[in-house]
Amino acid sequence: MKDSLVLLSRILAHPDSRCWFLAWNPAGTLLASCGGDRSVRIWGREGDSWICKSVLCEGHQRTVRKVAWSPCGNYLASASFDATTCIWKKNEDDFECVTTLEGHENEVKSVAWAPSGNLLATCSRDKSVWVWEVDEEDEYECVSVLNSHTQDVKHVVWHPSQELLASASYDDTVKLYREEEDDWVCCATLEGHESTVWSLAFDPSGQRLASCSDDRTVRIWRQYLPGNEQGVACSGSEASWKCVCTLSGFHSRTIYDVAWCQLTGTLATACGDDAIRVFEEDPGSDPQQPTFSLTAHVPQAHSQDVNCVAWNPKERGLLASCSDDGELAFWKYQPSEGI
């Protein structure tokens, strides 16, 4: 492996607590972290250092599990084990909690904005996925409650350019949803993982979806539209999703997160074996049966489980990670020549 993942900086982001998740703002200038200390922290670069610009600690009563920025970068959503989601409005360096979304019966596990910024999705241990509509007055209204999963829903993510939503669950499946006649419907169920699906990531085109699981594999699913040249069967006008690649044998424990770089198409994983791994699609790889190579591996990236990896949306190769050890780390991925 000629490629390298170089540590740039390591910060104790959430002392005496797990650091659960990270999210870059769309400009790539700020990073939000959240943790078991009930806080959200905003990090910004000053020179070669990353410093804490703001601590948001008034919004939640329990662990903050996930954070997500709006596409405009002016709002931050935080999902908490207290069963609420807070919406924070950015005013220069300060953030104000302007709305608290309530309705889930149990812990909210994930939150994600649609690319338009007009829709927000949340999911929970109560097995449901909620879709919220945002109007011009920044009022949030639940427009659909989806009960397609049979267990705890771990993660939600939107397609990068369409209003297509994906969710991952403790029931070992991935589900996809779209709007149909003023309501949201489940339009596909992706089966194949043998245990909990922890996280999801679309590739830059939105034609492929990566899923990672407690079964220690990453699966790559490809979308096939009706009438596709490959002859993959579709139901009526619905697209079909097929697993075209399984990355197995690389991880020794649960894979908690997968991130697909929107600039380079590089995959990164966060694992319960304390490691970070980076995969590149092989040059000339068949799109219908793609192959990926492990190009970087940091065995002790953190001293405990790695919970999240996040590629910077503007700076190639800049990767952030966080862990049960409460730390946040910044890495520079340097691919070898020829990739």
Swiss-Prot record:
GO biological process: chromosome segregation; iron-sulfur cluster assembly; protein maturation
Family, per entry: Belongs to the WD repeat CIA1 family.
Residue ranges annotated as motif LYR motif: 176-178
Keyword Kinase carried by entry: no
Stored Pfam families: WD40
Assembly notes: Component of the CIA complex. Interacts with CIAO2A and forms a complex with CIAO2B and MMS19; the interactions with CIAO2A and CIAO2B are mutually exclusive. Interacts with CHD1L, ERCC2, IREB2 and POLD1. Component of the MMXD complex, which includes CIAO1, ERCC2, CIAO2B, MMS19 and SLC25A5. Interacts with WT1. Interacts with CIAO3. Interacts (via LYR motif) with HSC20.
The keyword RNA-binding belongs to this UniProt entry's keyword annotation: no
Record-level GO cellular component terms: cytoplasm; cytosolic [4Fe-4S] assembly targeting complex; MMXD complex
Role this protein plays: Key component of the cytosolic iron-sulfur protein assembly (CIA) complex, a multiprotein complex that mediates the incorporation of iron-sulfur cluster into extramitochondrial Fe/S proteins. As a CIA complex component, interacts specifically with CIAO2A or CIAO2B and MMS19 to assist different branches of iron-sulfur protein assembly, depending of its interactors. The complex CIAO1:CIAO2B:MMS19 binds to and facilitates the assembly of most cytosolic-nuclear Fe/S proteins. CIAO1:CIAO2A specifically matures ACO1 and stabilizes IREB2.
Subcellular location: Cytoplasm
WD repeat intervals: 14-53, 59-98, 103-142, 148-187, 192-231, 250-289, 301-339
Protein name per the record: Probable cytosolic iron-sulfur protein assembly protein CIAO1
Organism per entry: Bos taurus (Bovine)
